[in-house]
Regions:
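Structural beta-strand segments of beta-rich domains
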Residues: 21-25, 64
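N-terminal signal peptide c-region/cleavage motif recognized by signal peptidases
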Residues: 12-15
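Asparagine-centered strand-capping/turn motif at beta-strand->loop junctions
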Residues: 25-32
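A short, solvent-exposed beta-strand micro-motif common in secreted/extracellular proteins
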Residues: 73-83
Length: 108
């Protein structure tokens, strides 16, 4: 019975992973500066997607939820650009397991 239960759990997780990622990532700004642009692109992409903040800003100390629907995987590159034009990039992040907290240590 234990082997059957383990197989069922593994099957569920493998099926979910194969179906892709359908969720979100929370991005927190702890840089000390307001973030004016936020880009989230698939890790294998050669270019950045559109700014997900649109006309909004992400003030220092605040968090925004970015919806990621129908993604082929949960591995993303995430870049923020602050009020001074400085960029912060996190590469190859598994957003199914980790949210993002940008700090000055992430500055490019």
């Amino acid at each position: 019975k234990k082997a059957l239960a383990l197989f069922a759990v593994l099957f569920l997780f493998s099926g979910h992973a194969a179906a892709g990622f359908d969720g979100y990532v929370e991005v927190t700004n702890n840089t000390g500066y307001d973030i004016y642009y936020l880009y989230v692109s698939h890790a294998k992409s050669d270019s950045w997607e559109e700014d997900v903040l649109d006309d909004d800003i992400l003030p220092n100390g605040h968090t925004v939820r970015v919806n990621l629907r129908n993604a082929k995987s949960s591995i993303f590159d995430i870049r923020a650009k602050d009020e001074d034009g400085d960029t912060y990039t996190i590469w190859d992040l598994d957003v199914a397991r980790h949210d993002v907290v940008f700090t000055l240590d992430d500055m490019d």
